[in-house]
Amino acid sequence: MVDYQTLSIVFTGLSISIAAFYYINTLRNAQKAKRYENIKWFLERRSTTEDMLNFAWVQNQEWEDYKDHLRKYGMKENPEAWARLWSYLIMFDDIGLMVRRGLMDIEDFYDISQRSIPSVWKKYQPIIEEHRKRGEPTSMIDFEYLINEMHSVSKRRGDNLLADLG
């Protein structure tokens, strides 16, 4: 025969298990919602005329070497160009941080950006690396992380979409 105390222990344990399951499920749903919001933010930003113009401007910059880049687009020499460039690059560094922390899904990001973001990285990688050597060793590390993750997705899928981008 089952006594009252045993039933009480069983129901307490069952209640705690149900509460834990509910809490974990709620956390998972909140994380999915946050990932969706972050992708939505990127899509909304990317589809603006201003962002398209920034992308074209960033991709059309030309320079011979790091010193020439500084002369044309450096913070002291050309603050407007510097701000425009680095605000654009920082956006991808921030996205890389979100991917690293699980706040944005790399598969989703890869599907919506594919070659455009890695092409920016390829163009500016020498500038970023020189910037790191000159005193900013962590400059754009999350942008680099994002690119590495995108390459992993490309290899995993076997699409070789990014093969020519290094």
Where in this protein do the model-derived segments appear?
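Membrane-proximal alpha-helical anchors
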Residues: 2-69
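Generic detection of intrinsically disordered/low-complexity segments and helix-coil linkers/edges
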Residues: 15-17, 57, 76, 103, ...
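An amphipathic alpha-helical interaction surface
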Residues: 80-166
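Juxtamembrane loop-transmembrane helix junctions in multi-pass integral membrane proteins
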Residues: 3-6, 77, 81
